[in-house]
Amino acid sequence: MADKAQQTPPPSTLRNNNYPGPQHPPTPSLPRRALVVGGNRGNLNRPPQRPPKPRGYEYDEDDDKENQGPGQERPPAKEEEEEGEEEERPDWSLRHLLGKWESDIEQLKDKVCRDLDNYKLKLGIHP
């Protein structure tokens, strides 16, 4: 019977710390760090910035000028001359803006349709 008295008590009594004997010291708690005023942490109330939108590749003819020697500049194309004439007209900017909006809306419409088709496939809805 003496052997049974020295055995470890059941776990339920260990959780309640009713076990007679040496107990572990409590875990020390660390003090809170002071907030840095004006530090480099940024404004925590400001929402995070969005990543930049991916843009399509736009070819710029000015990039080719570095490969040309002096005095070998290209003469302006007819389209560029016509654009210069249209800039003088007051309604050119409105027409240009409406045309740009039309192309942007078409691109957005195509992208939304592609995204919705992809979501349908992910959900298992086959067209």
Curated annotation (Swiss-Prot):
Further facts: The major E4 form is first synthesized as an E1^E4 fusion protein from spliced E1^E4 transcripts, such that the first few amino acids of the E4 protein are derived from the N terminus of E1.
GO annotation (BP), single: symbiont-mediated arrest of host cell cycle during G2/M transition
Alphabetized UniProt keyword annotations: Early protein, Host cytoplasm, Host G2/M cell cycle arrest by virus, Host nucleus, Host-virus interaction, Modulation of host cell cycle by virus, Phosphoprotein
Residue ranges with Acidic residues bias: 79-89
Name used for this protein in its record: Protein E4
Compartments, record wording: Host cytoplasm; Host nucleus
Function: Contributes to multiple aspects of the viral life cycle including viral genome amplification, suppression of suprabasal cell differentiation and egress of newly formed virions. Induces host cell cycle arrest at the G2 phase by associating with and preventing the nuclear entry of host CDK1/cyclin B1 complexes. Inhibits cellular DNA replication by preventing loading of host replication licensing proteins MCM2 and MCM7 onto chromatin. Within the cytoplasm, associates with host kinase SRPK1, a splicing factor regulator, and inhibits its activity.
Assembly and interaction partners: Assembles into oligomeric complexes. Interacts with host CDK1. Interacts with host SRPK1; this interaction may favor expression of late viral transcripts. Interacts with host cytokeratin components KRT8 and KRT18.
Family listed: Belongs to the papillomaviridae E4 protein family.
Gene coding for it: E4
GO cellular component: host cell cytoplasm; host cell nucleus
Species classification: Viruses, Monodnaviria, Shotokuvirae, Cossaviricota, Papovaviricetes
PTM notes: Phosphorylated by host ERK. The phosphorylation triggers a structural change that enhances keratin binding and protein stability.
Spans annotated as Disordered: 1-93
